[in-house]
Amino acid sequence: MFSALDINNNLVDIDRAIKQPLNKYFCTACKREVIVKNGNVRISHFAHKHKCDCDDYDNDMSEWHRNWQKKFPIKNREVVLKVDENDSVIENCNKIVRRADVLCYGYVIEFQNSPISSEEFDDRNYFYNRLGKKVVWIFNMVNEYDNEKIIHIQEWWNNFDNGGKYKWKYASKTFINYDSYDKDVILIFQFSDVSNEEEDREQGYFERVVWAINSYNDDEDTNFKYFCTSYYPRNFTELMDKIKRREL
């Protein structure tokens, strides 16, 4: 985790805590003590002082993940969400407490840099949707694209939108149950760190998945061997414009 509470219950970012490592900090979810980890192997982060199973949030900590989160105010990062223990939905959730990477304007934004199972992907979507939140996933696909595992075949367009058609060698099983027509779960693939046309070189370039072979229509599991994207939104500015307008 990259943020924690100080003794006055104020949110503190890891960059600030590194300068004051002897201060006490606490997990925003379980309220147990955490310590500053600032070594040479992993990116700087907070970790529980004693082993705790309140969350396995640190599984996807990376510089890429961190840079995305820093685009948002600290109050919107790593927001703890809970399901009411008396809610019947709890029977279908693996966890009753989760830490959203970002929560803003009614959207949960999850940044995924490492492999994730279809079970975990589905469970997070179910959890957040049941709390009335739409979920925006941003997956780091830069290596997949650069190594030509994901190949751009051609473009498509109509009167309302345009985008790309792709072929994916050895497609991930993460999305096997994903419904590409689900308006409450938005899937975005980042294909490059920088767009050649982009003045802000910190934004990167991505595309929103709008179609994949779908189990609801094709009587088989969702198959990302072939999928289509929209070119809009294509960067952080356009994404936030969509989110603020609640148009995703």
Describe these PLM feature segments.
Residues M1-K75:
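N-terminal cysteine/histidine-rich coordination modules
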Residues M1-L22, F26, Y145-L248:
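Non-catalytic C-terminal interaction segments of nucleic acid-processing enzymes
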Residues D13-K19, F26, E33-V36, N67-D123, ...:
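Active-site metal-binding core of divalent-cation-utilizing nuclease and nuclease-like domains
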Residues N129:
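Anion (oxyanion) recognition and catalysis
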Residues K134:
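Residues at the starts of beta-strands that form the adenosine-phosphate
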Residues N140:
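Cofactor-binding loop segments of dinucleotide-utilizing enzymes, especially the Rossmann-like FAD-
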